[in-house]
Amino acid sequence: MSSATSSTDRLPTAAGDAALQRLRTWPGEHRVAVGLSGGVDSSLTAALLVEAGWEVEGLTLWLMSGKGACCAEGLVDAAGICEQLGIPHHVVDTRDTFQREIVQRLVDGYREGITPLPCSQCNRSVKFGPMLDWAAEERGLPRIATGHYARIRHGGEQGRHQLLRGLDSRKDQSYFLYDLPQEVLGRIVFPLGELTKADTRGEAARHGLRTAEKPESQDLCLADHHGSMRAFLDAYLPPRQGEIVLSDGTVVGEHDGIEHFTIGQRKGLGVAWREPLHVIRLDPAMNQVVVAPRAEAGQRSCVVGAINWVSIAPLQQPLELEVQVRYRSEPVAAQLTPIPHTPEDEARQRPHRCRLQFLDDQFSITPGQAAVFYRGETVLGGGLIQRDDQAQTNRE
């Protein structure tokens, strides 16, 4: 008998029991590869699937050399969980892919004056798709499961797989999953989607998992790996001094790299001024950080490109919805309108774009971050915020 069986003599919590019932009645084959990072969320995901009677194998992606959740430390903890649960553990070396698709693109983005969102790109190009391919081709497993706090509803509009927020609003990760294509969403299981973090800790303790009290990572994995985001950027981008200026060109300070600033930032500017200033633009061509008082920093619209439509078909006419423009930001009301394709757009095969029109001024509309569209708890789609010279701001 595996330790997973012997460690579950205690009855599950109400939330844990509901999760087990959902897994036991899940349609289709109950055979799955679990993406294991070595943290408590993925550990409990594997434990619940084992307890629910699924055929489970652990799969860990080796993303980086060194220490941290995506490095050797995570591999050791993931292997220990698989041993405890009595399931096979596989490690796939994806360091080259991660360096090329995530690290280099992240560095390039910061160099160009945008603030990239590597987690969503990593989910699409490094994690979910490759994990599904590996599980099917190498182990004959039709599904993967992860410890994300999100939900999937099958059979939505036009038979689409719909992505929903996790029930724990403080841990909901749907914002980072908006870019997953339909063929991937149809083969994913999120056992923790209706649990809170407290539920997860409690269930992990019930199973006696070694990761039950493991602290959460508090930052981007690359920042954890290097000690801080600044240290990561300094390792790839040499200091390049430039000016901090007002929107009229008045020089108010100096900086050592635009990559260390983001739109909406107020603290840490190193500028003494008669009123608080906010970053409103990063200009890589001039190597300038442009700042302004809050009264001049509001923005009413932005352009969104590289859109992935999740729960609805591609938009053909304006739509009222809610949009979230940063992971920790609150959703706000907006209208989304398709931008007509020009002959030049067609000739260059540019992807379709949409314009977001906000009802109220927004102060952290950041090129490179995702704008994720919601209707209630359902993710309609999302895309990347682009630079937009036509954005309507209070400065005009």
Curated annotation (Swiss-Prot):
Catalyzes the 2-thiolation of uridine at the wobble position (U34) of tRNA, leading to the formation of s(2)U34. Residues 171-173, 326-327 are annotated as: Interaction with tRNA. This is tRNA-specific 2-thiouridylase MnmA. Belongs to the MnmA/TRMU family. Its EC number is 2.8.1.13. The active site is at 122 (nucleophile), 221 (cysteine persulfide intermediate). Keywords: ATP-binding, Cytoplasm, Disulfide bond, Nucleotide-binding, RNA-binding, Transferase, tRNA processing, tRNA-binding. Disulfide bonds join 122-221. The record marks 148, 369 as: Interaction with tRNA. NCBIfam families: PRK00143.1 (NF001138), trmU (TIGR00420).
